[in-house]
A protein has these predicted regions:
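Structural preference for beta-strand elements that scaffold enzyme active sites
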Residues: 18-20, 43, 73-77, 101-103, ...
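Glycine-rich, positively charged N-terminal anion/phosphate-binding segment
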Residues: 2-9, 24-97
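Alpha-helix-loop-beta-strand connector modules within alpha/beta enzyme cores
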Residues: 62-75, 122-143
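A short acidic, helix-capping loop that chelates divalent metal ions and anchors anionic groups
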Residues: 54, 110-116
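Non-catalytic, substrate/partner-engaging modules appended to enzymatic cores
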Residues: 15-16, 34
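Non-cysteine beta-strand/loop elements that form the S-adenosyl-L-methionine
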Residues: 46, 101-110
Length: 143
């Protein structure tokens, strides 16, 4: 085995390799993730999912979180800037998907995302980022 390709552990999730599919808005749906798994991806992420939309019970948003039939382990990426909303969204994600990982989007630079205090805006407000992360971890039961 090459030293570049090796097993990885995320919390209690053990993966046979370190080829991850990044979350890409508009692309990382279940069908695309399935094809990537067939071609060697060991772990995948959904495209970013709006915490606000999940809390409002938006069906189109829930569809984004569906597990592909060949996904053994995957992450649902959520975005938002309000700790309470993010916590409620994390609870909904776990209830509906049983995903192995919940990822908090802190990197999206798109203006319509950052103007709400989400995405990369969280990195400019460490206190808020901490509160969001703390709320999500608590809602996920420390997983």
């Amino acid at each position: 085995m090459s030293e570049l390709y090796h097993p990885v552990k995320i919390g209690n999730v053990e993966l046979k390799g370190n080829l991850f599919l990044a979350p890409v808005a508009g692309y990382s749906d279940a069908a695309f993730r399935s094809v990537c798994i067939e071609n060697g991806a060991c772990f995948t992420y959904t495209e970013m999912v709006s915490a606000e939309a999940l809390v409002r019970k938006n069906l189109k948003t829930e569809i984004l979180m569906r597990r592909a039939c060949n996904e053994k382990a995957y992450s649902v990426q959520i975005f938002g800037g309000e700790p309470e909303i993010m916590a409620e969204a994390a609870h909904i994600v776990l209830e509906k998907t049983h995903c192995e990982v919940i990822d908090i989007n802190c990197g999206c630079p798109v203006p319509k995302i950052i103007k709400t205090g989400a995405g990369s805006a969280l990195t400019r407000d460490p206190d808020r980022l901490f509160k969001v992360a703390e709320a999500v971890v608590k809602a996920a039961g420390g997983r």
